[in-house]
Structures are given as C-alpha cells and as structure tokens.
A protein has these predicted regions:
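Glycine-rich beta-solenoid repeat tracts in large extracellular/virion proteins
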Residues: 12-19, 38-49, 67-74, 92-99, ...
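Generic anion/oxyanion-binding catalytic loop in active/binding sites
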Residues: 33, 70, 204
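Acidic, glycine- and Ser/Thr-rich low-complexity intrinsically disordered tracts
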Residues: 42-43, 47-57, 144-247
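Right-handed parallel beta-helix
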Residues: 1-12, 21-36, 50-63, 75-88, ...
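Carbohydrate-interacting regions of secretory-pathway proteins
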Residues: 63-66, 70, 220
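Surface-exposed beta-strand edges and their flanking turn/coil or helix-capping segments
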Residues: 16, 39-41, 57-59, 94-96, ...
Length: 247
C-alpha cells in the first residue's frame, strides 16, 4: 500500500485485520484527519487476533508460554510500516491492537497521536519522529521481544499494565528532561539521551534535524525524506489536501 493520500475518514485510514500471513508493506502514505466518528483507534490501525489470541489476558499468556510457535503461525513474514506521515487527533497515529505481532515500524513522521503497542510480540519500532507525544505500551508480555529504539520522543511514556519491557527499550532521543527521567525510572533507556530537538522547518513539514546535532551525533537518529508522502502525480497532488502541522 504505497503513495496514497487518505483523510477525512470515520475510522482508520488503513486497517490491518489479523496477520494474514504478513509480508505487507505500508509506505509513503499521507494519512490524517482520521477516526472522526469513534475513539480507541488509529490512523494506521491493526488487530492481531490470530490463533494464539484470547480475550482473557491470563489465558493468552498461558497459551503463548506453552505454545510459542503459535505466535508467528499466522503472521509468518513481518509487516512493514515505513516512510509514512500520520496524524490522528482522536486516537493514535499508529495503533497496534489486540495481539498484533511481527511488525517493523521505522522512518515514520507521527504528527500528533503517538505510537501504541498493545499486547503482542516481536514489534521493532526504530527511527520514528513522534511529535508532541510518545510510546503507549499497553499490556506487554514479559517475553514480548519488542524493540523501541532511536526514536525522537517528546513526552513521558504512557504504560498501562506492562509486565515486561520487551527485548530493548533504549537508545532513544528525548526532547524533555522529565520524560527522560521518567523513562529511566521505569528501568530502561540506559543509553538514551535528552537534548534540544530543532527541526529544520516544522511549519512547512520538514522535521529533519541538522546532521551535526546531538540527535544525530549522539542519539544515532537518521534523517529520512520529508517530500515523498502521499500521491505522486501532479494532477492528484493538486487535488490532495495536507495535514495541519503541529506547533
């Protein structure tokens, strides 16, 4: 699913229902003004109610402990979410819900709603820009295998009933010292940094940072293109709207 401009939607702009063998790639989309008629949803939303999933969390924990092969039985190949510009004002920019597993999420510009990962396994979230928001980990398993690394984060993590912090939550770049200290108190982010984050021209949609900034030199963040989101043709570009840039 590539180079679409999707906006003014009652629910998600793109929704993935169950793993369906994985291997899906969602890239270079411009998705905003979503979730206009409900809540508890995301601009890119997913459900992972695969064969290991159970509505009772304790039973699901038992199933995955006893039969770990079930975790990737339905999402064999990773699902990739990359190079998208996303904004949700009534939910999350990315919402991986209900067991969503085996995801690679990188180089996304999240303009408002942050990234939520509910219970699931093997989600790698790296090198994303999370403007005015943060990571929302909900009900993580002790052995989730999740990775959250080298992301620009602006507010405190918002965990709910987290039983473990995945394989690696570290090497992130915090724009707020209190958010950084709160993350350290949770036991992770030992190698993360707190620094001033100065975007090139946020008002015009350029959220890259200077190559000599600490975000890059110490944090390891890698800039990615800011001009490839959405439709490609000149005709469609003239028709397509653009999201409001955050302040």
């Amino acid at each position: 699913i590539s180079h679409n401009s999707i906006y003014d939607t009652p629910r998600a702009g793109i929704n993935i229902s169950e793993g369906t063998w994985g291997g899906h790639i969602i890239e270079y989309n411009d998705i905003f003004n979503t979730v206009k008629e409900t809540g508890d949803h995301g601009t890119i939303n997913s459900w992972g109610r695969d064969r290991f999933w159970h509505p009772n969390y304790n039973i699901m924990t038992q199933i995955t402990n006893e039969k770990p092969a079930l975790i990737l039985a339905d999402v064999v190949e990773p699902i990739i979410i990359r190079h998208n510009r996303l904004r949700c004002d009534r939910g999350w920019d990315i919402d991986l819900d209900d067991g969503s597993s085996n995801y690679q999420i990188y180089n996304n510009l999240c303009l408002n709603g942050g990234i939520k990962l509910r219970e699931g396994f093997y989600r790698t979230v790296e090198n994303n820009i999370i403007v005015n928001n943060t990571l929302h980990p909900h009900l993580w398993f002790k052995n989730s295998g999740d990775v959250f690394s080298r992301n620009i984060v602006m507010t405190k993590y918002k965990p709910i009933s987290v039983r473990g912090w995945g394989r690696d939550v570290d090497y992130n770049i915090f724009a707020d010292s209190l958010a950084y200290l709160a993350a350290r108190q949770l036991g992770g982010d030992a190698h993360s940094i707190v620094t001033t984050v100065k975007f090139m021209d946020a008002a015009k949609g350029n959220f890259n940072v200077a190559d000599d900034s600490e975000v890059v030199t110490k944090g390891g963040f890698r800039n990615f293109p800011m001009n490839n989101f959405g439709v490609l043709s000149s005709r469609l570009k003239r028709l397509a709207a653009s999201p409001v840039m955050p302040v």
